């Protein structure tokens, strides 16, 4: 895989792209698992230079590590992603995760530990279980994250519907 053709080797890279083609807990529509490869394909068509930031993506040192393969269960995805991100951070590189459904956000926060997050979502995803007896799903991810980091470090934008 190549992220938009902006590729260097792993050793010199500053940014490591990881795809997480996962949508096992989606309940309305599936298909988020196709996003990582679709985003990569679309990245081939971007203009590389930004007048606003004076940054040319072509100058960034990006390595695409491909897609996470530990996807058989929610738990294996979370643990595999968390371990992968931890390794990338130990090497003083910046992980860039493209997914998939937002349950994967838990794996990212689990690896980062001391972070804040901004969530763009129409729902708060604060259910304790969804569906019944399922602790890790797209509808519970913000609640699970709030068990890892302070609620003061979570900002939700775009919320239009919640559950009591």
Predicted regions and their residues:
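Conserved alpha-helical scaffold segments that buttress catalytic/binding sites
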Residues: 1-164
